[in-house]
Amino acid sequence: MFIFASMNLYTIGHSNHSLERFLQLLQSYHVDCVVDVRSVPASNYNPQFYQEALDSFLQGKGITYVFMGHEFGARRLDSLDDTGQVDFEKAVDTDSFQQGIIRMQKILNDYQHVTLMCSEANPLTCHRFALVARYYNAHGFDVNHILSDGTSVTHKSLEREMVEQYLKAKKRVLPEIDELFGSYTATQQLNDAYRLKNKEIGFRTEHEEYYD
């Protein structure tokens, strides 16, 4: 495993914040580099987060902006399943994602407080949680998700919330699930929850208007 200057990583969603509010959130966590993981670095409803405008604004505040939507974006054609939906587990093994890991090695060594940025306010509804942050959490990083109210939540806490959400859904359909799945390990539960999350939020090729 690579050893970095910092093993901390943040994520954030720009949502409909003003640039000033977005800056406040970043500064609260001493962020010095924003890695944009949107496939399309634009927003129809929040033009302040177009790539050029955001890059210029952050540079003026002493924060580095890096676009990595090609490597870490959700809208990818290199890892589709048979239904035309992106498979996050396949995505991690693609050349583009692996190139992103290589690029991130330098970023994580050059900066102390790096955040991945996408559009959704809630990390649980975004691929930054289910794809990119999942990878770094599994590789020993302390991943924290910055929320719109200025608080943050650990990746592991969100994983527990996700597992509980899907287990509750299963129990509503099949109340005897505890007896039937007595050997259903925590690792299996987590992996299955990630797959269900993938099905819920993963990009489909017919959704051409999708921005992430």
Predicted regions and their residues:
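Residues lining hydrophobic/aromatic ligand-binding pockets adjacent to catalytic sites
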Residues: 2-212
